[in-house]
């Protein structure tokens, strides 16, 4: 009788284990903006949808949008962990410290933070080499400007944004030694009203080609209304400004998300600092305007191909900062660690970094 009961119990346990093994992997996402921002958060959510399409019923995804950076983020990340998510992606720089705190409290959950630099056993980081796209954007802007004044809408003065401002200006200077750059800080990732105000402030100063590090298409729309030019951010924003739009630098998160989810399923996931870019198609140039001058299109393509192949790295010295100091020595290319710590403007930018 005891043996029979034991066998029944073992059978039940085996059945339960089989059911448990078939349960989908739970993956959570937290976004700083709305999924409809048609920029940064939108493309992360496209990556989430790409996961669902690839894995089908093997996974179950959850997302929370419009989460402010700070205490609210810690609360939402905690809720995602308590809800049984096996892997959580936190997709904004300001989610870094909240993610670190929650990861320590949930050692059996795996976390990945976008654009950050703090690692732990169960916490990895991932970032795009957006500076590659900014350099090409600068090349296009430097060739297209008629006023020799291009503009950049910054979000927050963090290394990623400062690095990209530098890359854009270096790209512009490589084709136009006389070009100047104006910078306006919106102090937001996503706020169409503030982004429009920033765009108009730049154009009022003589800027005729704009770049942005904010997430809505508002700057492009503003440029379209005034007959000027702009470059899209994070997603294909061409439909909002068919005449103003030069091209968009599109983020493609799907390959990375698939790779990391598969690693969790295979038991091979590990904490790492991952950088993706043109070389692995995590960055692409979207909807290049067909009406660009032939020489501009040729230079865009050539610069893209050189960066994608690794033949050219934008942050290769000698590079001086705007104080006259050597920021990057001759024949040295900034390492990923160094790229993550850029806190200086390149020579020629006359603005000061807000502190």
Which sequence ranges carry the predicted segments?
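A residue-level marker of the well-folded mature domains of exported/periplasmic proteins
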Residues: 22-355
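Gram-negative bacterial Sec-dependent N-terminal signal peptides
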Residues: 1-21
């Amino acid at each position: 009788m005891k043996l029979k009961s034991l066998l029944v119990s073992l059978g039940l346990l085996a059945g339960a284990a089989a059911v448990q093994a078939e349960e989908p992997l739970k993956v959570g996402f937290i976004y700083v903006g709305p999924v409809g921002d048609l920029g940064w958060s939108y493309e992360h959510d496209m990556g989430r949808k790409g996961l669902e399409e690839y894995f089908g019923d093997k996974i179950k995804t959850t997302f929370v949008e419009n989460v402010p950076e700070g205490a609210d983020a810690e609360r939402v990340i905690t809720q995602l962990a308590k809800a049984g998510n096996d892997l959580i992606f936190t997709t904004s720089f300001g989610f870094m410290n909240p993610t670190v705190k929650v990861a320590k409290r949930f050692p059996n959950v795996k976390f990945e933070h976008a654009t950050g630099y703090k690692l732990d056993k169960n916490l990895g980081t991932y970032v795009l080499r957006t500076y590659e796209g900014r350099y090409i954007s600068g090349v296009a802007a430097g060739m297209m400007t008629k006023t020799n004044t291009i503009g950049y809408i910054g979000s927050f003065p963090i290394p990623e944004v400062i690095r990209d401002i530098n890359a854009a200006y270096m790209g512009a200077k490589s084709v136009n030694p006389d070009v100047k750059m104006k910078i306006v800080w919106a102090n937001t990732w996503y706020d169409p009203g503030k982004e429009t105000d920033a765009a108009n402030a730049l154009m009022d100063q003589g800027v005729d080609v704009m770049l942005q590090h904010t997430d809505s298409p508002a700057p492009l729309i503003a440029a379209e209304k005034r007959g000027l030019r702009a470059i899209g951010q994070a997603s294909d924003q061409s439909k909002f400004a068919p005449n103003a739009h030069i091209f968009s630098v599109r983020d493609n998160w799907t390959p990375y998300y698939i790779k990391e989810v598969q690693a969790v399923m295979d038991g091979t996931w590990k904490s790492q600092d991952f950088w993706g870019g043109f070389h692995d198609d995590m960055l692409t140039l979207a909807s290049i305007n067909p009406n660009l001058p032939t020489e501009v299109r040729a230079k865009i393509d050539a610069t893209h191909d050189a960066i994608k192949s690794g033949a050219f790295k934008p942050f290769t010295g000698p590079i001086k900062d705007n104080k006259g100091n050597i920021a990057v020595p001759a024949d040295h290319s900034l390492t990923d660690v160094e790229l993550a710590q850029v806190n200086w403007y390149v020579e020629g930018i006359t603005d000061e970094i807000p502190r």
